[in-house]
Each structure stands twice: as C-alpha cells, then as structure tokens.
Amino acid sequence: MTEFWLISAPGEKTCQQTWEKLHAATSKNNNLAVTSKFNIPDLKVGTLDVLVGLSDELAKLDAFVEGVVKKVAQYMADVLEDSKDKVQENLLANGVDLVTYITRFQWDMAKYPIKQSLKNISEIIAKGVTQIDNDLKSRASAYNNLKGNLQNLERKNAGSLLTRSLAEIVKKDDFVLDSEYLVTLLVVVPKLNHNDWIKQYETLAEMVVPRSSNVLSEDQDSYLCNVTLFRKAVDDFRHKARENKFIVRDFQYNEEEMKADKEEMNRLSTDKKKQFGPLVRWLKVNFSEAFIAWIHVKALRVFVESVLRYGLPVNFQAMLLQPNKKTLKKLREVLHELYKHLDSSAAAIIDAPMDIPGLNLSQQEYYPYVYYKIDCNLLEFK
C-alpha cells in the first residue's frame, strides 16, 4: 500500500494558481510526487473559538478513527487467515481501492451534510465509528470463542498417541465391555520396545488374558495396543508397565460421550462456516464506512487548520501528494521553498528533530503549510 501527504496552501490570485505552482514544482523535479487536487466543499466556518477547540478534538478523532480502520483491517486478515491478496481484495472504500478513493475524493453530502456545523459533522463521524468499534468487539468475541472451541477439539484429535483423543481411533470390538471382572486397557508402546511388549505384557501382572493384545493404531514413534485383564490387577499392571516404558492411557469406552463430542465438533465446524460469510461481508462494509469516515476527518482537519492559519475569507487549495519514496527529503525541501514565506517562525525548519524533550507530535510535524499524512499501510502480516 502507500502513503499520501495532504497539504494546503493559501490561494494566490486564484486557488488554481496555487495548485499549478505546486504541480509544476513537484513534476519538474524528477517527479517528486504524483499530485492531485483534494476537493473540500464550502463548509460552515463558525467562530474562531469553536475552530480552536475543534482542532484539538479532530486530532483525537483522527487517531481514534484510524485505530478502528486498522482494527477492522487486521481482523479481516485474521478471519481470512492472512491470505494477503484475499485481504487486499476486500479492503475497498465505496467499491474502489483505497488509492483511487483518496485521489478522487468527493465529500459525501448524504452522510455528512455541509449545512451542518463542523462540530455536528465531527460528532456524526464519531458516533458512526464508535458504533463500528463496538460492533466489531462483540462480533469478534463471538467468532473467536467459536473458533477457539473448535481449535481445542481439533487439537485433542491431533498430536501423538500419548496425548491425543483416542475416541476417533478405537472401535467397540477392541474392548471387553460390561464385564464384572474383566477390563480392557489401552497402552502406548514405543516402537523400539514393541518386541519387549509382545514378550512381557502377559506377565506384567497376574490375571492378564493371554493373547489379548492387538495393535490398534500407530504414529511415528509408538503403537497403540489393547490388553484385557482382571479389574483387580489394573493398578499393579499400570505400575509394571510404566517401569518398562509402556504408558497406560486413561480411557473408558463410552459411546454416548464419543457421539456427543463428535456432534459438538460438527456443530462448531458448521457454525463457523455459517458465520464466516456474513462476518467477512460485515467487515468489508464497515471497513469501507470507517475508511471513508477517516478521510472525511482528514478533510475536516485540513479545512479547520487552513482557516486558523490563513484566515478569512476562506481561500486555500487542498492538495494531495503521493510522494516518491526515494526522494522524500527533496520533496520536503521543495515544499519548504514554496511555502516558507507563510510562517517566519518555520522558515529555518524543514524537519524538526525527533528527540527534543517535551516536543509533542503536532510540533514535530509542523511546517509552514498545513500538512497531514495518510498512511494506507493498514496491515501487519505475521
């Protein structure tokens, strides 16, 4: 994905001239950036006091909405299990890819009517995105619980014969059932010791039924064998078996329990499949909603900051730059030359040092022109 710089500068004789000047400066210098106009409608200005307060509120709203956008995108990646191409296909805004949406940005008059005050518009955005955030938490929690329960059951049916569930491996015929005196045990026998098992199992304790052991299953290291003996000899048999590196598994053949476990696994698997489609659709729709809201917050911030810096009547041009990554420093210098006259205190600053104690982010990124970054790198793939 990519990064944009959203900037504004005061209109020269016309706003078109401001735009042409920037475009010429960035294109003649080895194409430092792809530039386009960023269209912001005539919003209601309100009073200076309101604008100053709103400037701080919008900074917080910007960070909050960006956080929600990233959370929805990241959860989409989790649900699609990090299939990167598949995730990018679903991260759209208004049905188009994010770069297209930003570069062709048009204010959504229906969602955010410009007859409303700036504060009202920001509150509409905050309310909508808070709802998305809350819905995401509850949907993610429900889906994660389902997925976690299914994974726990699947984990039981995986792994070595020493730890995995044996219910899927054994059959009723492998056991002596409903006997008052006899019981069948399941024993994990290392492959290296299998010959010892055959020679010894009948004598590990008294009252072992001769020739009652068969191999029921195997994995890389071990065989699973059954053996039938008298109930009262079980403790002695377990003890002697352990001494000879044969491990008796705790297992009782119970058809009802095994059937219930299988049904539970099928139910969870079916529920997960049922929820997957609607969840991905919800994430897709609400990612779009949140991303659109985020770019509108950026537009509001540019508008408010431009009025505060450049004064009334409203006369500025908002412009979008997609910088060439190799020439970021050069682009900063060109912008500095173009706009340093706007603020004498910033005339000596191109990039504020990052390590001045007490310097907050807004000061770090202070330039003589209005500047906000839009970073579309929304995902962290594991």
UniProtKB/Swiss-Prot annotation:
It is found in: Cytoplasmic vesicle, Secretory vesicle, Synaptic vesicle membrane; Cytoplasmic vesicle, Clathrin-coated vesicle membrane. Ubiquitous. One of its GO terms (cellular component) is vacuolar proton-transporting V-type ATPase, V1 domain. It comes from the Eukaryota. Its main location: membrane. The modification N-acetylthreonine is found at residue 2. GO terms for biological process: proton transmembrane transport; regulation of macroautophagy; synaptic vesicle lumen acidification. Pfam families: V-ATPase_C. One of its GO terms (molecular function) is proton-transporting ATPase activity, rotational mechanism. It is a peripheral membrane protein. Subunit of the V1 complex of vacuolar(H+)-ATPase (V-ATPase), a multisubunit enzyme composed of a peripheral complex (V1) that hydrolyzes ATP and a membrane integral complex (V0) that translocates protons. V-ATPase is responsible for acidifying and maintaining the pH of intracellular compartments and in some cell types, is targeted to the plasma membrane, where it is responsible for acidifying the extracellular environment. Subunit C is necessary for the assembly of the catalytic sector of the enzyme and is likely to have a specific function in its catalytic activity. V-ATPase is a heteromultimeric enzyme made up of two complexes: the ATP-hydrolytic V1 complex and the proton translocation V0 complex. The V1 complex consists of three catalytic AB heterodimers that form a heterohexamer, three peripheral stalks each consisting of EG heterodimers, one central rotor including subunits D and F, and the regulatory subunits C and H. The proton translocation complex V0 consists of the proton transport subunit a, a ring of proteolipid subunits c9c'', rotary subunit d, subunits e and f, and the accessory subunits ATP6AP1/Ac45 and ATP6AP2/PRR. This is V-type proton ATPase subunit C 1. The gene is ATP6V1C1.
